[in-house]
Regions:
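A short acidic, Gly/Pro-enriched loop at the edge of an enzyme's catalytic core
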Residues: 19-20, 84-97
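Conserved class I S-adenosyl-L-methionine
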Residues: 21-30
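Conserved SAM-binding loop of SAM-dependent methyltransferases across substrates and taxa
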Residues: 31-44
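Helix-to-beta-strand junctions that scaffold the AdoMet/dcAdoMet cofactor pocket
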Residues: 42-43, 139-141
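S-adenosyl-L-methionine
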Residues: 51-89
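Mobile active-site "lid"/loop adjacent to the S-adenosyl-L-methionine
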Residues: 56, 92-133, 150-157, 180
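Class I S-adenosyl-L-methionine
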Residues: 91, 144-147, 152-263
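Polybasic, low-complexity RNA-engagement segments
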Residues: 208-211, 216-371
């Protein structure tokens, strides 16, 4: 239902204007707080591709977006610079929360000072410049790019902005809606309008140090990123039977069965080959010996009224904790049909169970269970 973030860190995803139906790229996304806000703005439309260069962080990113029930997703584990040519002019919006020297976080975590001594602004500035150019190249004409860091370094902030504007003349800075505590970027007399960028200082706002700049790409785009499909897809009977028990909206043409796992992929997703993909689309579940078992991710993507058999527990019911720990629970006091059951808490889906004679066999994902 919510993701706790440091106040200043909430600013980038809040400032980037997302419209329903957009194709969005979160380039340096782990652990996923910004991706969840971007996905919330999309409201299960369009596509969000969320990426991290670290494999372990990308897997943590996947869990966070699946916890939030994001169906229209693709999670990558790529060097964002290396895939720029694959997604040239593809995205309506790009968010770059760039790796940085972290000067704005020293007050919160003084261990970062030692990391800064090892790799400071000079180290990160070159990485940032490559990333910001790649982000601009992946943006459609008329699209918007948000660049942010959690550092005070002018080399990593305003100088990165100047690097983009100098090397991509079709990009320009645009104004960010004022907010109490925002400060202007450090301007120069070179005509780059750096006052349109925003600096956040901890003595002016209840958060740590941050820098945010919003760009727009010249031109207008009339092309769709949707990929065409041909013909109709016949679903296995056991899968169709389960999907018919839901009112979840989907296009069978985008059902993709890989070995035994069933995915609902996005009509916007580009060709997969050659990409390190952690997850492409919503994992619906798995086909096992003439039966279909729905996934944890599918449960999180549903609403209570989209499945025909629900157990809705109160948040104060001690069975909620027992369910989260993976225990079988007694549900004799509920009018729940036998078979697959969507377990909810105050109307919000939590996972699956299988009811047999008033005993709910626990199907909560093992890796998510409380110890």
């Amino acid at each position: 239902l919510y993701y706790i973030q440091e106040p200043s860190a909430m600013t980038p995803a809040n400032v980037l204007p997302i419209e329903e139906g957009d194709v969005v790229f979160d380039m340096c996304a782990a652990p996923g707080g910004k991706s969840t806000e971007l996905a919330a703005k999309l409201n299960k439309t369009g596509l969000i591709i969320t990426n991290d260069i670290s494999n372990s962080r990308a897997k943590a990113l996947l869990k966070n977006v699946e916890v939030f029930g994001v169906p229209n997703l693709c999670v990558l584990n790529e060097d964002p610079v290396g895939i720029a040519s694959r997604f040239s002019g593809f995205f309506d919006k790009v968010l770059i929360d760039a790796p940085c020297s972290g000067e704005g976080m020293f007050r919160k975590d003084n261990k970062l000072i030692k990391a800064w001594e090892k790799n400071g602004p000079e180290f990160y500035s070159q990485i940032q410049r490559n990333i910001i150019l790649a982000g601009a190249d992946m943006l459609k004409p008329g699209g918007k790019l948000l660049y942010s860091t959690c550092t005070f370094s002018k080399l990593e902030d305003e100088d990165s902005v100047i690097h983009l504007l100098t090397n991509r003349p079709d990009m320009h800075l645009i104004d960010i809606k004022p907010y109490e505590g925002f400060s202007h970027g450090f301007d120069t007399d070179e005509g780059y309008h750096l006052e349109k960028a925003v600096r956040i200082f901890p003595h002016k706002m209840p958060g740590e140090g941050h820098f945010v700049a919003l760009f727009e790409k010249d031109g207008e785009d009339y092309t769709s990123s949707k990929r065409p499909v041909s013909g109709k897809t016949k679903l296995p009977d056991e899968l169709k039977e389960f999907m018919d028990s839901t009112t979840f909206e989907y296009d069978p043409a985008y059902i993709n069965i890989r070995d035994t796992r069933v995915f609902l992929t996005s009509p916007y997703m580009a060709e997969e080959r050659g990409l390190r993909i952690i997850r492409n689309g919503l994992l619906l579940g798995e086909l096992k010996k003439n039966r279909f078992e729905p996934s944890q991710a599918f449960a999180m993507a549903l609403t209570k009224d989209q499945f025909n058999n629900c157990l809705d527990l109160s948040v104060s019911d001690d069975r909620v904790i027992r369910y989260l720990k993976g225990e079988t629970i007694d549900i004799d006091d509920f009018n729940v049909k036998s078979g697959w059951t969507l377990v909810c808490v105050d109307g919000y889906p939590l996972g699956w169970g299988k009811n047999a004679n008033g005993q709910l066999k626990n199907k909560y994902l093992a890796g998510w269970r409380w110890m």
